[in-house]
């Protein structure tokens, strides 16, 4: 079903989608919309590092998918005036892969590791000395001929991004001097992002159209941009010169995205909990089995937003559907749960 992992998916789908994201990315902190606290702090840290002619401290960015962690890493590199190498935790399978990446870095460069919580343990342990003292020791050869080789590294900045900060080991987490939590975006921030993206797309959008789109974007820029692309298609086929609220509502109704940004999977999840488990508490694995989704998919893609808007709550016994969610779905809240 395309709506599951297409429109509201938090991961880019294919080369074309990735190219669109690159086109929309700001290059400087002043162009970056949202996350004001993080921007202000980074401005200070970057200016201080530049004045000392040092590499920026290692940075950990964590929060739900689609909030701009990769974009912010690239902005940091641009502000520092250095090169950036990008990779992901699963792509660094063995120590040799890490050595190859580190060997390409010049003084001050940035190494960006997405999904850093998925680094293999042996690679993570090699990172400790690289991050703290700028060297790595690797063993060359096998058996009696095996011997350690000491590799000094230039000062560099590791930027790690994760949706699961709790899965990072304490030794790795403690080596990040700068730790920033990415928050969901406000409607005003998303509206500004939508206007900026529409301009890049050479697409006209009215104020009420941008506002309506921001309401349905789950506080997430990546989703806002994806929905904008799809609504643009509907507007073009309908012969509209500009995107208004009516075409946004029409398009997203067909895509089964409601006025709070919930899609078919969100509603299926909530209705399963209500109809089969009296609104909870119910365990995540049970929910996943009932709706045919992976627990990781629910935990990373759907649950954070439902928690954010107060539609579910987490308890030691499982997830609960809140009265607010019942009201949104048009279902009367059971009197025996009051």
Swiss-Prot record:
S-S bonds: none
Binding positions for DNA per the UniProt entry: 314, 319
Listed name of the protein: Holliday junction branch migration complex subunit RuvB
Organism (species): Limosilactobacillus reuteri (strain DSM 20016) (Lactobacillus reuteri)
Known function: The RuvA-RuvB-RuvC complex processes Holliday junction (HJ) DNA during genetic recombination and DNA repair, while the RuvA-RuvB complex plays an important role in the rescue of blocked DNA replication forks via replication fork reversal (RFR). RuvA specifically binds to HJ cruciform DNA, conferring on it an open structure. The RuvB hexamer acts as an ATP-dependent pump, pulling dsDNA into and through the RuvAB complex. RuvB forms 2 homohexamers on either side of HJ DNA bound by 1 or 2 RuvA tetramers; 4 subunits per hexamer contact DNA at a time.
Binding sites annotated in the UniProt record for Mg(2+): 70
Reaction equations catalysed: ATP + H2O = ADP + phosphate + H(+)
Gene designation: ruvB
Location, primary (coarse class): cytoplasm
Entry EC no(s): 3.6.4.-
Lineage: Bacteria, Bacillati, Bacillota, Bacilli, Lactobacillales
UniProt similarity note: Belongs to the RuvB family.
């Amino acid at each position: 079903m395309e709506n599951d992992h297409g429109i509201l998916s938090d991961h880019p789908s294919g080369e074309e989608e990735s190219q669109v994201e690159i086109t929309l990315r700001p290059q400087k902190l002043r162009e970056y919309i949202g996350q004001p606290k993080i921007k202000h702090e980074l401005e200070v840290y970057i200016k201080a590092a530049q004045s000392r002619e040092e590499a920026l401290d290692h940075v950990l960015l964590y929060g739900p998918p689609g909030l701009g962690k990769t974009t912010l890493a690239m902005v940091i590199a641009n502000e520092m005036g250095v090169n950036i190498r990008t990779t992901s935790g699963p792509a660094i399978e063995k120590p040799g892969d890490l050595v190859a990446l580190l060997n390409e870095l010049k003084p001050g460069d940035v190494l960006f590791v997405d999904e850093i919580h998925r680094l293999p343990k042996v690679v993570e342990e090699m990172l400790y000395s690289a991050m703290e003292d700028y060297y790595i020791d690797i063993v060359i050869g096998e058996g009696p001929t095996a011997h350690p080789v000491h590799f000094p590294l230039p000062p560099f900045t590791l930027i790690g991004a994760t949706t699961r900060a709790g899965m990072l080991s304490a030794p790795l987490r403690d080596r990040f001097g700068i730790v920033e939590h990415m928050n969901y975006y406000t409607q005003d921030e998303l509206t500004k992002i939508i206007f900026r993206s529409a301009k890049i797309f050479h697409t006209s959008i009215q104020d009420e159209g941008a506002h309506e789109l921001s309401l349905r974007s789950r506080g997430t820029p990546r989703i806002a941009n994806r929905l904008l692309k799809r609504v643009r298609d509907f507007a073009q086929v309908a012969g509209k010169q500009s995107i208004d609220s009516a075409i946004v509502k029409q398009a997203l109704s067909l895509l089964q995205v409601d006025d709070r940004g919930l899609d078919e999977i969100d509603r299926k999840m909530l209705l399963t909990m209500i109809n089969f488990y009296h609104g909870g508490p119910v365990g995540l694995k049970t929910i996943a089995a009932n709706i045919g989704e992976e627990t990781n998919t629910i935990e990373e893609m759907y649950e954070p937003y439902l928690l954010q808007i107060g539609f579910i709550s987490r308890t030691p016994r499982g997830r609960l559907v809140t009265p607010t969610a019942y009201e949104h779905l048009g279902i009367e809240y059971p009197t025996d749960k009051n």
